[in-house]
Amino acid sequence: MSTSIELFPRPLQDEVVDYSSESTVGVEAGRTEQSWNEDFAREQIHNLVRQLFLPGWPKPLRQVVFSPVDSGTDVLSICIRVGDALAEQAAGSCCVAETCPVQQEQILAEGCSAHSIQKQFGTLRDSAEQLSSNLWFMSGEVFQQGHHGPMSALWLRARLAELRLEFDYTVFQGPVVSGDTAAAMLGGLCDGLVLVLAANSTRRLAAQKAKETLSCANSRLLGVVLSERTFPIPASIYQRL
């Protein structure tokens, strides 16, 4: 089985968002399935970055939110991979930022050190964890540094302005859209929001409600990312390996 991440800038049409039966892929001779999967996933991420950040017209996107429709959907790993690809392709500083704290174990699993979740003082960039020459990871604790309670539009607007001064691009791991208004508010204050759907579990009704929530908040929906998508490689291909 293989997993892909794709951007669909169009309305969803299926009761269950599952494109697994629509795609088949081949494996080049002499390559393992794991090697092909890794290259394919990397290509998907790079295409996603080019669609969102690099066209530069009518104006370049600098702050983009990735928010799930359902709780439990893995968004952090997508954001980190998008940030890594963006740092490779873009000429500027990039940051992957959580908007709310998560468990330390989850951060460490994505390749960030414990140093990044310790509260520090100074500029936001100084408090973030530098992952490469132009890529930083900002934990939820650092993002909300000096703030307590629910995010207000006034505080959030000021924090986003700080980030624009310190980073050329910021990829946000946003809250669940169906949870409250925080995701829609964040998307409205940023350049837009990408909905993250789990291919085999997100239902059409939940996705439609999420889109309505964003529309009511005047939050720009940039597209839909389909994650956790699996599809079979034909048996005839396996027989040639």
What are these regions (language model features)?
Residues Q51-P55, D84-A85, E162, T213:
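A generic secondary-structure signal
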Residues L76-A97:
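A conserved segment at the C-terminal end of the G1
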Residues C79, I107-S116, K209-E212, S236-L241:
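Short, aromatic/basic amphipathic alpha-helical patches
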Residues Q89, S132, C216-S219:
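Short, well-ordered coil/turn elements that cap or connect secondary structure elements
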Residues M1-F53, Q208-L241:
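C-terminal lobe/tail of nucleotide-utilizing enzymes
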Residues G149-L241:
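Conserved catalytic-core segment of NTP-binding enzymes
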Residues S21-H46, R50, W57-R62, S67-T73, ...:
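P-loop/Walker-type NTP enzyme "switch/lid" segment
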